[in-house]
Amino acid sequence: VNFPPLGPSDFTADLWGALQPSTSERGRGLRALCGSAYSLPLLAPSACERWLAEIAHARARAPSSDPPNSMHDHGVDLVRLGFGPRIDALLARLQPLLARLYPQFDGARLDSHHSYLVEYGRDLDESLAWHADDSEVTLNLCLGEEFSGAELTFLGLRCREHMQTRPTADEVRSFEHEPGTLILHAGLHRHRVEPILSGTRRNLIVWARSTHLRRGTPPPAASYCPLHG
């Protein structure tokens, strides 16, 4: 079963403002967080609830599978469950915004992705150590549910050469997730997940990738890494 793309009523007015080409509306609802990171209210509450229900239904019918990557003990690959077309359509809808925010990471030509659900809570993943993603740009969309803790902490954008360097005090910034709100960041922007204190948090993670960039010349580190000043 393939799940269809989300419809216009599933998205917030903030998304339409952020996608506007005119300067009068451009960026409405888009919030700069730190470095490469931004947040945007994306989905209506009903869309989040429906997506979680669809995921639960698909998981109940699918054979058990391994976690989506080596960092997580829980979660599921959403493409394997049939959500690939929906996520393809979501990336296409966001493409003008990604092109504008991430030109150095080929945001205009993100043509593949690894997409999965992460789950934090009691008897689920409780936190996540610092890391960078195997993506040009990462989309982190909170779908629910009720929870406290499990904040996303950023630790500075680095090239591969300087990935192990300490972050400055200004680079360490934590942000709470809110259901329906999307957080965007460069894949090389280091981050971790703080311990969850109560409830359950479920997020859609999309590692968006550019075949053109990966087959060609990588972006110059000086265009994004502060240690190449």
Report residues per predicted region.
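Intrinsically disordered, low-complexity regions enriched in Ser/Pro/Gly/Gln/His and often acidic
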Residues: 9, 43-44, 113, 200
